[in-house]
Amino acid sequence: MQTYESDANIGNIKILAVDMDKTLLTDDRVLPQGLDERLDKLADAGIVFCPASGRPAPKLEEMFEGIKNRLAFCPDNGACVIYRGSYIYKSNIDVELYQQVLSRASKDPRAVPVLCCFDEFYVLARDHQYHDEISVYYNTINYVDSFEGIDFESNKISVFFPGYDAEPAFRETYSPEFSDKLYVTNAGREWIDFMNLGVDKGAGVAHLCEHLGIDIADAAAVGDTYNDIPMLERVGHSFIVDNAEEHMNAHAKWRIPSNNDGGVLTLIDAILAAR
């Protein structure tokens, strides 16, 4: 697979959408040193940097607190899009439909369901033991005895698998049962996410491009795993980190260094140098 240096039109990139976990973040789940000054340079050059993640908006904005109003965000796997502090797109799930998912996951001994309501999140009180793991991704967590009767505006249901068995659960249970009604995606060994059909990171990036009047051929995406495939296949410039799962080679054009080796920083430097 060719490296990023082979992208002859890298200087044409106007939007850079980047996955977070195992792509931008190191294995210790921290942002790479040297990112802040590069984000300033991208903004000054008129290039939109867009974290694209299964993480919700509050957590993403918290990670980029000092510069968030100069960025775009594609949280919740594209179920909403934010540009410079304002929502430009939301996709809410029908209450009856998300209750079906919550009911099924609540009966699964492997699963810890999370109802995502943009700024607040709901988890069963019985699952409070997993607070430390869940709070890595979700800020304001409300513990409830039951999901029954809840009808809040929601754009995503996430299911956490503390036994690291999300992949078989996705293949054997949740995708077969719900993929005709919702977009079901597997985000590594710990999480399965449910959004409306037609919602994914690729659609989120497309909404951002449309809002800004930018051709998606001039957008770039970087990822490492399954839920990054839609945006990698939709943009004009698709990159995977060197630590990406092997099957991802089929879904991107170019490779950059690993997350722990600052691959996204290397790509940003190359984009800026080519302008």
Describe the role of every protein-language-model region.
Residues 66-69, 77, 177-180, 234-235, ...:
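Short, structured coil segments at secondary-structure junctions
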Residues 6-15, 31-32, 193-275:
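Mg2+-dependent phosphoryl-transfer enzymes with acidic/Ser/Thr/Gly-rich catalytic loops
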Residues 28-130:
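Active-site phosphate-binding/coordination module
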Residues 19, 53, 224:
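Active-site glycine-centered loops adjacent to acidic/histidine catalytic or metal-binding residues
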Residues 5-45:
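N-terminal glycine-/serine-/threonine-rich phosphate-binding loop
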Residues 60-64, 170, 174, 232, ...:
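Hydrophobic packing residues within well-ordered alpha-helices of enzyme cores
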Residues 67-70, 90-93, 130-134, 201-203, ...:
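Short, hinge-like loop/turn segments at secondary-structure boundaries
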Residues 104, 110-234, 243:
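Conserved acidic, metal-coordinating active-site core of Asp-based
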